[in-house]
Amino acid sequence: MSTTPAPANPKVGFVSLGCPKALVDSERILTQLRMEGYDVVSTYQDADVVVVNTCGFIDSAKAESLEVIGEAIKENGKVIVTGCMGVEEGNIRDVHPSVLAVTGPQQYEQVVNAVHEVVPPKQDHNPLIDLVPPQGIKLTPRHYAYLKISEGCNHSCSFCIIPSMRGKLVSRPVGDVLDEAQRLVKSGVKELLVISQDTSAYGVDVKYRTGFWNGAPVKTRMTELCEALSTLGVWVRLHYVYPYPHVDELIPLMAAGKILPYLDIPFQHASPKVLKSMKRPAFEDKTLARIKNWREICPDLIIRSTFIVGFPGETEEDFQYLLDWLTEAQLDRVGCFQYSPVEGAPANDLDLEVVPDDVKQDRWERFMAHQQAISSARLQLRIGREIEVLVDEVDEQGAVGRCFFDAPEIDGNVFIDNGSNLKPGDKVWCKVTDADEYDLWAEQI
């Protein structure tokens, strides 16, 4: 007796662009689709429809998003667009009129509904067959995960359009955040990377109201959240920390080993004049004093930051002020961007002199050379010391991992020459044998 084979599950291709916050959005959409019986495939040719999660933070990111949308249309033909650039539906359709649907950031239900319209889910789908793990679908390696604690931002930095794309701050309930963190740890995650548009503002919008986790009260506030996360027994790393005064409360937690002594805090510039034009905190002298105090409390503290050079009105004097400030601050990990005007940003309306492109490039190169010397000198101090390393990759040559001062994708690596016996997700103590401006070399102890 012949039997009719069951129809195949509908298949979705997915391209995720932009920052870790967008990656978390992609994970949420994929989790919902997987729960409904969709298979996620890795090639355009195998997909019944392709979803592109776009980035719209700067013009180069928009250009990349439009290029990827075009590639997906060429290779597949059925394309749904979502994410930050989705707020510019007109611009997207002007370039790619054949896209099937366009939705903005955080519009998870609309994306899933758009997929339903193009490729309906199987009517006889049995959720017990296509089980989704409790932690959901993750696009990161199994041993680390991003934990998004809020959406949106209440600031009005003149170079940024995030509030217009993602709205005002909306903090997730603290119990929900901690439940997710606990599920991730139970699934094998060894490192939680706490992210949002403005991590240190967590709870401001709900006046730090008290929530509950595991039957105990917990305030919706950054310090209390970190205290609770520290009980899970994994690395907890903080990203996108705006320099509020209450950030000082986090440093003792780092000194006590409750969370990693790693602070990702974007200063953007040091010149008071430029910071004022950016609508950023302009207390560079107090910032230096705070950094000094933080390091006195927690000597192992690693500070990562990002800066913008070539902002409208930036003079050579302003730029030199920034270089001198970097010398004083002795930051560990630093990224730098040349200012790029973004459509809709308030900075476009400032009556300030535009910095020529060749001057921007020159300042960027000087900035990077200046900071590389600082970063290299600070890493040289690690030679001979023992560090704990979380392994990311292993091959016959050895292992590649990160220690507490390395976030994935953006910071350096630790190369373990005798680490071919290890596996991703292992934690191992090593002795540092060499260093350059970004990376360390070490041997297992």
UniProtKB/Swiss-Prot annotation:
Protein's GO biological process: tRNA modification
EC category: transferase
Subcellular location: Cytoplasm
Protein's UniProt keywords contain Transferase: yes
GO molecular function: 4 iron, 4 sulfur cluster binding; aspartic acid methylthiotransferase activity; metal ion binding; protein methylthiotransferase activity
Entry annotated with the keyword Iron-sulfur: yes
Cofactor requirements of the protein: [4Fe-4S] cluster
Positions bound to [4Fe-4S] cluster 2: 153, 157, 160
Cofactor note: Binds 2 [4Fe-4S] clusters. One cluster is coordinated with 3 cysteines and an exchangeable S-adenosyl-L-methionine.
Enzyme Commission code: 2.8.4.4
InterPro entries from the UniProt entry: Elp3/MiaA/NifB-like_rSAM, Methylthiotransferase, Methylthiotransferase_CS, Methylthiotransferase_N, Methylthiotransferase_N_sf, NA-bd_OB-fold, Ribosomal_uS12_MeSTrfase_RimO, rSAM
Domain Radical SAM core: 139-378
Reaction(s) this enzyme catalyzes, per UniProt: L-aspartate(89)-[ribosomal protein uS12]-hydrogen + (sulfur carrier)-SH + AH2 + 2 S-adenosyl-L-methionine = 3-methylsulfanyl-L-aspartate(89)-[ribosomal protein uS12]-hydrogen + (sulfur carrier)-H + 5'-deoxyadenosine + L-methionine + A + S-adenosyl-L-homocysteine + 2 H(+)
Domain TRAM: 380-445
GO CC term (a single one): cytosol
Pfam families: Radical_SAM, TRAM_2, UPF0004
MTTase N-terminal domain location: 10-120
Function recorded in the entry: Catalyzes the methylthiolation of an aspartic acid residue of ribosomal protein uS12.
Family (UniProt): Belongs to the methylthiotransferase family. RimO subfamily.
HAMAP family: MTTase_RimO
Name of this protein: Ribosomal protein uS12 methylthiotransferase RimO
Organism field: Pseudomonas fluorescens (strain Pf0-1)
